[in-house]
A protein has these predicted regions:
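Conserved P-loop NTPase architecture
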Residues: 1-167
Length: 168
């Protein structure tokens, strides 16, 4: 069966949380803050690929999600950024919002790439909050959520042949 229209649920990755940590050494009981920042969430991109014939992959698996960013760690270690999710669709695919039927983008050329959803920013660790006034900050920020949405993929095809009249 040929699938030329399908509904999908897409979600970008969430940013990692910041970390609260303090330097610990043998003869230094009160070390400074060294909590790392969280990693950025993965983006969700769409690529037009000539090797994909129809939208069959999205009919049987309608939910696609990018990876989340990792949280920060002690020792000023920042979290790793989330891996991007790359979705391959055939050229001629139109992406529109499911609720409002607004066309978001069209992928007409082969190897055309569009970033549809952006991943969330990573949170800040306590090392970024230190100052001359506040030398032992115990605050951090959470990572931002990634963008998400419900979309409809529509494949526009052009017929190679046309029949006029009734075929016998």
């Amino acid at each position: 069966m040929f699938y030329d229209q399908t509904k999908v649920i897409l979600k970008a990755g969430k940013g990692g949380h910041g970390c609260v940590s303090f330097l610990r050494q043998k003869y230094m009981p009160n070390g400074g803050p060294n909590g790392g920042n969280g990693g950025k969430g993965g983006d969700l991109r769409i690529v037009a690929d000539v090797n994909v014939g129809d939208l069959r992959a999205f009919h049987f698996n309608p939910q696609w999600k990018a990876k989340n960013g990792e949280p920060g760690r002690g020792g000023d270690q920042n979290g790793k950024g989330g891996e991007d999710c790359v979705i391959k669709v055939p050229p001629g695919t139109v992406v529109q919002l499911r609720d409002s039927d607004e066309i978001v983008c069209e992928l007409l050329e082969p190897d055309q790439e569009i970033m549809l959803l952006e991943g969330g920013r990573g949170g800040r660790g306590n090392a970024t909050f230190k100052s001359s006034v506040n030398q032992t900050p115990r605050q951090f920020t959470d990572g931002d959520p990634g963008q998400e949405g419900d979309y409809v993929f529509i494949l526009k095809t052009i017929a190679d042949i046309g029949l006029v009249g009734f075929p016998n």
